[in-house]
Amino acid sequence: MPKRTDIHKIMVIGSGPIIIGQAAEFDYSGTQACLALREEGYEVVLVNSNPATIMTDTTIADKVYIEPLTVESISRIIRQEYPDAILPTLGGQVGLNMALSLAKTGILDELNIELLGTRLSSIEQAEDREKFKELCKELGEPVPPSTTVNTVEEALEFGDRIGYPIIVRPAFTMGGTGGGICNNHEELAKIAKNGLELSPVTECLIEKSIAGYKEIEFEVMRDHDDNAMIVCCMENFDPVGIHTGDSIVFSPSQTLSDKEYQMLRDCSLRLIRALKIEGGCNVQLALDPNSFDYDVIEVNPRVSRSSALASKATGYPIAKMAAKIAIGMTLDEIKNPVTRTTYAEFEPALDYVVCKIPRWPFDKFSKADRTLSTQMKATGEVMAIGRTAEEAMQKAVRSLEIDEKDLYSETAHHASDEEIEQKLVKAQDDRLFYLAEAFRRGYSLEDVHELTKINFYFLDIVSHMVEMEKNIQENKDNLETLRLAKKYGFSDATIATLWNESIDQVRDLRKKNGIIPVYKMVDTCAAEFESKTPYFYSTYDGENESHKSGKKSVIVIGSGPIRIGQGVEFDYATVHCVKALQKMGYEAIVINSNPETVSTDFSISDKLYFEPLTLEDVLNVCDLEKPEGVIVQFGGQTSINLAAGLKDHGIKILGTSVKDLNRAEDRELFDQIIKKLKLNQPKGLTATTHEGVIKAAEELGYPVLVRPSYVLGGKAMEIVYNKSELEEYLHDHVDIAADHPILVDDYLDGRECDVDAICDGQDVLLPGIMEHIEHAGVHSGDSMAVYPPQNFTDEVKDKIMDVTRKLALTLNCVGIMNIQFIVRNGEVYVIEVNPRASRTVPFLSKITGIEMAQVATRVIMGESLAQQGYSDGLAPEPEMISVKAPVFSFSKLADVDSYLGPEMKSTGEVMGSDHTFAKALYKAFAGAKMQLPENGNVLLTIEDKDKEKILPIAKRFARIGYRIFATKGTADFLKNNGLHVDLVTKVHESENADDNILNELREGRIDLVINTMGHDIEKNSDGFIIRQMAIQQNVPLLTALDTADALLTSLENRSFATDALK
């Protein structure tokens, strides 16, 4: 059926900020969908609250609204735009839930707006646990024994009757939010309560656990004419019981017999047809490893995280096809963009193995509960492609950018046998390394299978790699062993360690003997048809399929997996760098390892290499492509860290030189520049021993800011207020050495700001100054920020510009750089310089209209700012005011303290823009899901040092009609200052009393918590327990008084003043 001509304007709802369970894959799918609809001639209106994405670029849709994803906000846009239809199935769970909410308000019926793609009834049938179970019964498809509950009592009755373990799955949530495996009555009571609170419809499915079964996923497509096909089959390394987003995944499936595959394939096709889904969907199935019995776990009636992985694994662009199906086209009339000759109905065939490994945030959150279960905890993922499962897995491990570069872990090596067995039984993020260690110690496949229930085939892969380690070690400099090692994915670095040689010695031996990788094309059809995709992976098997084009080329290094501190913002900058290079006539080549992002869409760059971002893997591509040079400024710290190694091997680094990058990043060299330029800086000292750090802190005087050098996202950065806190910090965090010194800074309390500058060696363009709303001490990534700044005089702005210019020119910056300042009493202090793009680039680019990454790329390639039409200095400020607000994923990470400090904790961001600061704040808070009633109850739990500061804030809350609740110390202080306060008892006082602080939160009597008890970071401290309870109960929580002040500004502008005349 040809595309529909009765609709012309389509609204696409995006997925909002990045949180755990909903990451950059929806930027990728949303971008693809918008472009596909425009390609077919439709006018596209996009609504999304996330400024960090490519999706919210003005080139992606005809109209782009960066507005809160609330019913109120979207309804307003609908009445303004009058779209003919809405496409909600590409914005993750947020988009789906928003479509359901809009439908319930009646606005879609009132304005005769159609929902495209999968019908609402189908979405409800797939998402509503009880309706889905009934459908499976009708189809004769098996599901685990289960019941749907709306109360904790119902859950406990079922659990006690059917027996444990039990799995809790809340309805209409994402990433397993609120769910879990319960082994007894007490665990079920706790998890069911949490799950019911987090489900928007207060409903959970309680089912008998089938943990230990194989977990298989099918990505399925169906069109209006009932054509249906399988895009990809994926198999989880981990058995059922660990969320698929936290599982290692292989594609194609590795252990299914043809009979099992056909049986599960048929089941998936029956389900998508029965649900009448139009577009893409993800079917999760559990297979008993000892029989042909299987159970249906769930169906996601939309594009998902697995769809992005399947798209990159096969080269088949699922979101693009789903968008075209939504407008009435059928699979047999849509061309496959990879081959450009076959049609979309052909099922992809793979002649390689893909391995995905999740990237978890536990390097940031060392005290978090690392146990993996049915609730997702990973922030991102990496993907690697190889000819064997071993090669794919080894490449994926080294793509993770963690301490382990292969299957050897120093921590696992020093663990006792008892600790290793505990790690195998209770899955955590590092279980893979303990599996390898168990095999090194002689555990049999049977022993390890008994402890883990992981399939023998996957255990054999790990065991084989451990055997190969031994083989490599015993055959030093043997060429056959070297060939075999490379075939199975061993890196030069691992081989060098096993041979006790340098990496360059292994590399030289390999190259001298012609042991070099070939690059194979990802073509969707196992080379059956000619393919046009410039999408490649390396292997040491067969013929090379990637050839130099003859055009001048530039390699752009991506930013790797999404993690806290290095998010989708860097992918945004990478994509814009590619666009600028293409406009200048260069062949733009991307190297990246992240399957979720737009930069790894093969249609974005001229050539895509899906490779780990290690020196060896990047050099191999450089050896083949012989580029004009490599750009490292847009891939975050990942690419910057590769610059020196690339230069040492003769590769030209374009833009700021490696020497100057080092001058900005090395503390002592940077201090010399500050002194030479006579600039202000917080006093700081460097130490290389524990004793040296303590001495430095005493010399500067507490509080001090401590951190390692060369880090991103404030990793291991803390404000410490006394010697005992400093000793605990040193014990918890840090390996100190001469080449890894610790920086100790005097902590300055002032107003922080961020600038991104572009310098061509002569002129310096400052697109904007972003003022942080929180005072210094909260990491810039966790601060709310406003542009244009609201509290800086022209004199301060001039000083910032002057200092920026001096630093950019002295550091010989060519391209982009980021500087963070503290403004105190009209003086400007330099905190740090990052000689690369920062996470604020997308936000500033969108609100200033200056495509910063593109302008910087042109500068890097030799085009001056003047030639591009920009002059030296601060760019003119727009009339609109924009606020950026961070978004956190604390509900997914038990035991992570939500108190904000210098170490970054946010996973995403939203933006609010309007003509006044108060309205922009309101939108930013709404986008971050902090919508408060005009009057309600606020709980204040405040440190003594903040008591004076809380008084004006408390008075303002009282004035707009909020009731104030506080514990005795704060309550007495506020009462003495004339305020009415409701007293609550402390955490450990009369715990069962109705007015105990935790009971007040549990019973839903509190609308907002302001808690500044931050230094007490112990898990049993009152401050920590209150913060955890607020997050569990989904109560808005603020830990900085500046944020409370901003929230009040927003609330006051919604409330009427009620002042007596006298």
From Swiss-Prot:
UniProt: Mn(2+) 4 binding residues: E832, N834
All residue ranges annotated as the MGS-like domain in the record: 930-1062
Region Allosteric domain, residue ranges: 930-1062
Chain spans, region Carboxyphosphate synthetic domain: 1-401
Domain ATP-grasp residues, every copy: 133-327, 671-861
Sequence positions that bind ATP 1: R129, R169, G175, G176, K208, I210, E215, G241, I242, H243, Q284, E298
Comment on protein domains: The large subunit is composed of 2 ATP-grasp domains that are involved in binding the 2 ATP molecules needed for carbamoyl phosphate synthesis. The N-terminal ATP-grasp domain (referred to as the carboxyphosphate synthetic component) catalyzes the ATP-dependent phosphorylation of hydrogencarbonate to carboxyphosphate and the subsequent nucleophilic attack by ammonia to form a carbamate intermediate.
Gene symbol of the encoding locus: carB
Family matches, as InterPro entries: ATP-grasp, ATP_grasp_subdomain_1, CarbamoylP_synth_lsu, CarbamoylP_synth_lsu_oligo, CarbamoylP_synth_lsu_oligo_sf, CbamoylP_synth_lsu-like_ATP-bd, CbamoylP_synth_lsu_CPSase_dom, MGS-like_dom
Name of the molecule in the record: Carbamoyl phosphate synthase large chain
Family listed: Belongs to the CarB family.
